[in-house]
From Swiss-Prot:
The active site is at C76 (nucleophile), H164, E166. Heterodimer composed of a glutamine amidotransferase subunit (A) and a GMP-binding subunit (B). It comes from the Archaea. Residues 1-187 form the Glutamine amidotransferase type-1 domain. GO terms for cellular component: cytosol. Keywords: ATP-binding, Glutamine amidotransferase, GMP biosynthesis, Ligase, Nucleotide-binding, Purine biosynthesis. This is GMP synthase [glutamine-hydrolyzing] subunit A. InterPro entries: Class_I_gatase-like, GATASE, GMP_synth_GATase, GMP_synthase_A. Pathway: Purine metabolism; GMP biosynthesis; GMP from XMP (L-Gln route): step 1/1. GO terms for molecular function: ATP binding; GMP synthase activity. The gene is guaAA. Signal peptide: none annotated. Gene3D superfamilies: 3.40.50.880.
Length: 187
């Protein structure tokens, strides 16, 4: 089962709905859930978006403790938390709209971007963003608005996206989530 960590984002229910449409077992759980409870039940973990890093509950601990055990996908805030956990830099994106249609260039088609074209249109939030990826991570997508639209670990199944694949406005969003479900052994 894929467990979706709820960081109080407005779209968390759409992540589960996408998995439901695929027939993939998924459950939304509070970000206060103990990492050990997540470990016992998860074939994979999605760290959802949300309004602030200060309200991320145990999301950082879940990333730290489950790294190398199950695939983890960070979306928006989850992407930023993953970067922070591994030593990357996250900062405010001055002068950027909070949500915007963004053309994203896929630089690396491994993992969650397998089978996707080189460019997609995505719905993204850029209030905060990853400014520097951690060591052992590579940038897998970029845009004119954000140099780190997505990243992945060089060896472990850790993926982060600044944009929202769960939204219908994001081209190939369901394909990204389907690729993640495959990495989790759910498809």
């Amino acid at each position: 089962m894929i467990l979706i960590i709820d960081n109080h984002g407005q779209y968390v229910h759409l992540i589960r709905k996408n998995f439901d449409y695929m027939g993939v077992p998924a459950e939304i759980i509070p970000n206060t859930t103990d990492p050990e409870d997540v470990r016992e039940r998860a074939s994979g973990v999605v760290i959802s978006g949300g309004p602030s890093r200060e309200r991320a509950g145990n999301s950082r601990e879940i990333i730290e403790e489950l790294t190398g055990e199950v695939p983890i996908l960070g979306i928006c805030l989850g992407h930023q938390l993953m970067a922070e956990v591994f030593g990357g830099k996250v900062d405010w994106a001055a002068g950027r709209e909070e949500y915007a249609r963004t053309e994203v260039e896929i630089l690396d088609h491994e993992g969650i971007f397998e089978g996707l074209p080189d460019k997609i249109v995505a719905w993204a939030s850029h209030r905060d963003e990853v400014k520097e990826v951690p060591d052992e991570f590579v940038v897998t997508a970029r845009s004119d608005r954000c140099e780190v639209e997505a990243m992945r670990h060089e060896e472990l199944p850790l993926y982060g996206v600044q944009f929202h694949p769960e939204l219908k406005f994001t081209e190939y969003g369901p394909d990204i989530l389907k690729n993640f479900a495959k990495l989790c052994g759910e498809l």
